[in-house]
């Protein structure tokens, strides 16, 4: 069966094009996370979905964590194929790392929760919807007040259920659904375990305040040479594309235009080749030769 432990399951955004390009994709992925939890014998301590990569801190055997990975990749690929019949989903390559000491575990949890902040998407962790960030060390009464008006799974008619969740599998009837339409992570994330690991809100705040991105990225062999967050660089690229070519959808640029745009982004913002390639949808190896 294998020994259970804490694992960091992650994908590298520098190896992946955009995974979740709009709110519908994020909502679908959030519901898939909840479904994978039900299907696998893992405990989810923390997770975040970014537009081009994901992170999960899981407790289970390595085999159970890999099953979780495989189900997530399969389910999201199916959803993407149905939503975009003529396009292929970006390849989602997961790596897995055993977490072998307590301090690294606490740093890793904080790193995952901080991901939205580090990418420039939110001012604090609980502002970033597509994660477990808003669950930890919350006053129970306020948490209950927040979710008490939300629908539960039992409120959803069977005809709407399949359309909403893209599955015949049933979620527990008392699970809450957010106003955005995804299963609330508080239903399945083991945030109480996380609180017991940190022991106090002071300790949690301390670790959240530690800028460990470079240290964690190096331990995961992730390249973090980024001059601007993806969101900001993408906005700059769109504005530059509109100015140069009158085009705001970067996918509509031809190869020559993308190369020229990439050169301008490199000159103006000194971003890495991999980041620019991801933003303008070009093979980084091809772009590197040209830049």
What feature does the model see in each segment?
Residues 52-60:
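Short beta-strand->loop micro-motif that forms the acidic, two-metal-ion catalytic signature
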């Amino acid at each position: 069966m294998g020994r259970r432990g804490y694992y960091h399951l992650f994908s590298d955004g520098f190896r992946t094009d955009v995974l979740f390009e709009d709110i519908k994709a994020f909502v679908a992925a959030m519901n898939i996370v909840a479904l994978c939890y039900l299907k696998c014998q893992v405990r989810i301590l923390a997770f975040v979905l970014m537009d081009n990569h994901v992170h999960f801190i899981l407790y289970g055997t390595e085999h159970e964590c890999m099953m979780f990975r495989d189900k997530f990749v399969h389910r999201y690929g199916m959803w993407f194929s149905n939503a975009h019949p003529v396009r292929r989903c970006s390849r989602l390559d997961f790596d897995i790392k055993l977490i072998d000491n307590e301090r690294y575990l606490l740093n890793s949890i904080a790193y995952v929760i901080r991901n939205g902040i580090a990418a420039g998407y939110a001012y604090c962790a609980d502002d970033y919807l597509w994660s477990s960030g808003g669950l930890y060390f919350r006053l129970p009464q306020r948490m209950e007040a927040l979710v008490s008006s939300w629908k539960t799974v039992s409120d959803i008619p069977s005809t709407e259920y399949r359309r909403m969740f893209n599955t015949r599998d049933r979620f527990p009837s008392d699970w809450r659904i957010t106003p955005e339409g995804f299963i609330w992570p508080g239903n399945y994330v083991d945030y109480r375990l996380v609180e017991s690991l940190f022991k106090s809100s002071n300790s949690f705040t301390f670790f959240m305040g530690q800028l460990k991105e470079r240290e964690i990225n190096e331990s995961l062999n992730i390249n973090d040479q980024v001059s601007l967050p993806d969101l900001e660089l993408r906005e700059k690229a769109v504005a530059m594309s509109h100015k140069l070519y009158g085009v705001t959808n970067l996918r509509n640029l031809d190869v020559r235009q993308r190369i020229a745009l990439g050169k301008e982004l490199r000159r103006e913002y000194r971003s890495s080749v991999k980041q620019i390639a991801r933003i303008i949808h070009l093979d980084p190896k091809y772009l590197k030769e040209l830049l």
